[in-house]
Every structure is written in structure tokens, then in C-alpha cells.
Design a protein with these regions (language model features):
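Active-site neighborhood of HAD-like aspartate-dependent phosphohydrolases
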Residues: 3, 7-8, 12-26
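Gly/Ser/Thr-rich phosphate-binding loop
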Residues: 43-46, 66-74, 83-145, 157, ...
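AMP-binding/adenylate-forming catalytic core of the ANL superfamily
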Residues: 72, 180, 185-186, 196, ...
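Glycine-centered tight turns that cap/initiate beta-strands
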Residues: 94, 119, 155, 193, ...
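Active-site glycine-centered loops adjacent to acidic/histidine catalytic or metal-binding residues
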Residues: 102, 127, 150, 213, ...
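Conserved ATP/PPi-binding loop(s) of AMP-dependent carboxylate-activating enzymes
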Residues: 151-155, 166-199, 240
Length: 334
């Protein structure tokens, strides 16, 4: 990828929460979220505590106390695991803030994080490699904007368009478009992919990024992630946003993680399939479907539920839905 040098300056100058003493780094520095933790630490003169992985969360939590870590950047998978742990055995009093990216946190997870970390400021953000961090929710808005990833960071303009290129008003769903000096210049030696993702802006030489992500915006200008355009499920002639079904699943006590995909169905066109990781081994597929039936329209109902010990991940920590779709038979874990 070709990324302008101004990108790092915009993100660093914004600072966000990074007035820090010590930052714990779980993210691969070869991925943008991890790389910017390194740059931020240099910018503010902090200390970076490196972790190999989240395979041993108790050791990581112990190191937070030992090193007096003040900032913890994570992704939804990591926070879902933290919410299932007894944190009272660890000294986390030094933590001042948590940041989340890769995918939006379910509102129920944010509520639980607030309960388990009452003294910590939580930043819910959205970004992609092509534009880096793009949206953030001011922490003081968490209670009144549940599920939102906020507004554009300074120096960024963001809006929503329909397939015809018209800007949409609040309450409507469309593709997020991003404008700013931090939008990357293109994919290395891939002109067709570059042309599909980027279009000319109003200033000569400027590029707009068409993210491929569906959002809606409320009357206050706050953005809500709906899903990837290519993740939308077309079932019974209706469009189903997986994120809406996933939020319902996450609201069921005992569900640690959930991912929803569409699978071919000869009658429905596509059927909704839910993959669920449970924290409660007694939770059954039947109970999960009953919960969905009570909270979802018929066309959004999962045809089946597959229980998993864990969900496949991309290198950036997102759920790998392509891998989930690939397992057509999708047998449950033993």
C-alpha cells in the first residue's frame, strides 16, 4: 500500500487518549493499529510494554500491575475474554484508558467493561488500513450513544452515500466515504483495485476512500457500523445486517462471542447462520434460538446455531467470516 507520510502526523497530532506513561502492546506492529501504538509512545515519551500474544491473559494482567501500565489498546476478541475473567485478583489501578478497534464493541460489552473498569476511560473507534483511525466516540457519549463509533477525528470528513453516489440523510444506511490527507494513495502495483476503492475528490490530486462498509448516521452526526457490503445477507427477499443479529446474540447471558454469516439455501436464497462461543457450557442451541425468536423479525432469524470453542481470526484480530462461510457443513465443535 502507498500511504502518505502525513497520515502518521494527523493521527499523532490528534493524540486521542495518548497522554500516557506506559502502554501495553498486544497488537502486531506490522499491522497499522500496532504500528501506531509504537509511534504514539515515541510521540509522548512513554514506555511500551510488549506482549507476544493474548494466549496467557493472566500473565498479561499481572504485567499491567507490575509495570503500572496506563493504556491498553485491544480488539473485541481480547475484551470478550477479559469480561469472562475474575479481575479482582489483579492490580489494574494504574489503567487510565482502553481503546478498541478492528470491529465495533457490542453495547453489552461496553456496559460490562464500564462495570469492571469503573475508573477507566473507554475509547470506541473505527478505522481501516486505507484511512487509519477515522471515527471515534468521545468517552462521555458512551451512555447516550450505545453502539456508535462516534464522529470523524479532526482533519477528516466522513459521510454516507447510496449506490448512485447521493449523500444520505440521518437514519439511512449506505457506504461510508472518507476524505482527508490521511487517505492512502493506492494499492501497490494494483491499479484496478485502487480504482475500485478510491475516487477523485474535489481538490486536484485528492482521493476519496469508499470503504466498503455500511453505516447509518443519527441526527447528531454519530456513525453506527452496520456491516460490510459483501457481508449483507439476502434472505426471503430482505436484507439482513449480520451486526444487528450479533447484537441480539451478545445480549444473551452466557454468550461470549457471536458471528453471523449467510449460507446458500435453495428456498430462502441465503439462510442466516450464527456461530456462537459460550461462556456458559450449559447454554444450548435451542435456548439461543428461543432468545433470537423473541427479539428478531422472522426474516432475521438464524436457521441454525453452531457452537464453537473459538472463532477464526484475521491477522488484524477481526472475525474471519470468509473462513466461517467456507465451512459449509459447519459441524459443531466436539
Amino acid at each position: 500500500m502507498r500511504i502518505p507520510m502525513t497520515t502518521k502526523h494527523i493521527y499523532i497530532d490528534w493524540d486521542g487518549p495518548y497522554t500516557l506513561d506506559e502502554l501495553e502492546e498486544l497488537d502486531d506492529p506490522r499491522i497499522d493499529y500496532g504500528l501506531y501504538q509504537v509511534l504514539m509512545t515515541f510521540r509522548v515519551g512513554g514506555t511500551l510494554v510488549l506482549e507476544d500474544s493474548f494466549a496467557f491473559p493472566a500473565m498479561m494482567l499481572q504485567r499491567i500491575g507490575t509495570e503500572k501500565v496506563t493504556g491498553f489498546p485491544g480488539v473485541p476478541t481480547v475484551f470478550a475474554m477479559l469480561l469472562q475473567m475474575d479481575l479482582s485478583q489483579h492490580d489494574l489501578s494504574s489503567l487510565r484508558y482502553l481503546t478498541n478497534t478492528a470491529a465495533s464493541l457490542p453495547p453489552t460489552h461496553i456496559q460490562e467493561l464500564r462495570r469492571k473498569f469503573p475508573h477507566v476511560t473507554i475509547f470506541s473507534m473505527y478505522g481501516l488500513t486505507e484511512t487509519k483511525r477515522t471515527l471515534y466516540l468521545p468517552p462521555e457519549w458512551l451512555d447516550r450513544k450505545p453502539g456508535s463509533v462516534g464522529v470523524a477525528i479532526p482533519g477528516t470528513e466522513a459521510w454516507i452515500e447510496d449506490d448512485a453516489g447521493h449523500r444520505l440523510e440521518s437514519g439511512q444506511t449506505g457506504e461510508l466515504v472518507v476524505r482527508g490527507r490521511h487517505v492512502m494513495r493506492g494499492y501497490w502495483e494494483a491499479p484496478e483495485a485502487t480504482a475500485a476503492r478510491f475516487r477523485p475528490g474535489p481538490i486536484p490530486g485528492e482521493r476519496l476512500c469508499y470503504t466498503g462498509d455500511l453505516f447509518r448516521m443519527d441526527a447528531d452526526g454519530c456513525f453506527y457500523f452496520v456491516g460490510r457490503k459483501d457481508d449483507i445477507i439476502k434472505s426471503r427477499g430482505e436484507k439482513v445486517a449480520p451486526k444487528e443479529v450479533e447484537h441480539v446474540l451478545h445480549a444473551l447471558p452466557g454468550v461470549r462471542e457471536a458471528a453471523v454469516v449467510g449460507v446458500p439455501d435453495p428456498i430462502l436464497g441465503e439462510a442466516v447462520r450464527a456461530f456462537v462461543v459460550t461462556a456458559d457450557p450449559a447454554l444450548t442451541e435451542r435456548q439461543i434460538l428461543a432468545h433470537c425468536r423473541a427479539h428478531l423479525a422472522d426474516y432475521m432469524m438464524p436457521r441454525d446455531v453452531v457452537l464453537r470453542r473459538e472463532l477464526p481470526r484475521t491477522p488484524s484480530g477481526k472475525v474471519d467470516k470468509k473462513a466461517l462461510r467456507g465451512g459449509e457443513a459447519a459441524p459443531a465443535d466436539e
